[in-house]
From Swiss-Prot:
Keyword flag Membrane: no
Domain of life: Bacteria
This protein's encoding gene: kdsA
Species of provenance: Desulfosudis oleivorans (strain DSM 6200 / JCM 39069 / Hxd3) (Desulfococcus oleovorans)
Keyword Transmembrane helix belongs to the record: no
Record-listed E.C. numbers: 2.5.1.55
Entry GO terms, CC: cytoplasm
Example of a GO MF term: 3-deoxy-8-phosphooctulonate synthase activity
UniProtKB keywords: Cytoplasm, Lipopolysaccharide biosynthesis, Transferase
Recorded family membership: Belongs to the KdsA family.
Name the record gives this protein: 2-dehydro-3-deoxyphosphooctonate aldolase
Length: 279
């Protein structure tokens, strides 16, 4: 059993109900961001699923210098603040430099650290020092048991409000695979809740030359497997028209597929919980 991380009226881990962290990869503008958040809130409210909205305001790790990065910290955080206040939903976004941490902590309920930066000690401890819930994305190059060292770095800042997100492991060039053993391994070795990123796990990094490709048709399959393996939450990037998304469209889930998938995940979670209770 993992720690329980409490955010307002949402409990994550420790046997609490499955949590959904979802939203567009990047903020394209206020209207589309609000529309996505409204849609997701309506669906999760109807299904009784705890919901945290996510969107990035500065994608600093795009493949190409010419790729769309987002509106930047000032406008991006203002958009997230407006969505948060209008819909009364908690918000998550990622920071990429230490200079972004302070302003982000004034708005975000959860601060996410990018997978590529999980080994950066000063960065991890600076994010953790805010006292906010921190979502550490496990690097694609990191073994599940090695995440314990990253969690320990965050703990040295006096912060135990830590989530870990599994998002696949590199498999040769331009490909990722998921080892679902990683979910219970990281839960058991760190005592922290583990979230599964079902959309970045189907990414084909750099697979289109100047940008990453993806295989969004496999998102539901991997999400179902992760919940069966005991994930405490599911992370989904969604878009009303993924083929026209300005970032990560190939691995984003169309909005119309969200409710059927979440309905299935709730059923799987219930079955897995009941089975564990009889084990």
């Amino acid at each position: 059993m993992t720690d329980t991380i409490v955010l307002n009226d949402i409990s994550i881990g420790g046997g609490a109900p499955l949590v959904v962290i979802a939203g567009p990869c990047v903020i394209e503008d206020y209207d589309t961001t609000l529309q996505a958040a409204e849609f997701l809130k309506t669906v999760t409210d109807r299904l009784g699923i705890p919901f945290i909205f996510k969107a990035s305001y500065d994608k600093a790790n795009r493949s190409s210098v010419h790729s769309f990065r987002g509106p930047g910290p000032d406008l991006g955080l203002d958009i997230l603040r407006r969505v948060k206040e209008r819909l009364h939903v908690p918000v998550l976004s990622d920071v990429h430099t230490e200079s972004q941490i302070g302003p982000a902590a004034q708005v975000l309920d959860i601060i996410q650290t990018p997978a590529f930066l999980c080994r950066q000690t000063d960065f991890i401890t600076a994010v953790a020092a805010t006292g906010k819930i921190i979502n550490i994305k496990k690097g694609q190059f990191l073994a599940p048991w090695d995440i314990t060292q990253v969690v320990e770095k965050a703990r040295t800042a006096g912060n135990e409000n830590i989530l870990i997100t599994e998002r696949g492991a590199m498999f040769g060039y331009n490909n990722l695979v998921v080892d679902f053993r990683a979910i219970p391994i990281m839960q058991q070795q760190t005592g922290k809740p583990v979230i599964f990123d079902a959309t970045h796990s189907v990414q084909l990094p750099g697979g289109q030359g100047t940008c990453s490709g993806g295989q969004r048709e496999f998102v539901p399959c991997l999400a179902r497997a992760a919940v069966a393996a005991g994930a405490d939450g599911i992370f989904l990037e969604v878009h009303r028209n993924p083929d026209k998304a300005l970032c990560d469209g190939p691995n984003s889930l169309p909005l119309e597929q969200v409710e059927p998938l979440l309905t299935a995940l709730v059923a799987i979670r219930q079955a897995a919980t009941e089975q564990a209770g009889h084990a």
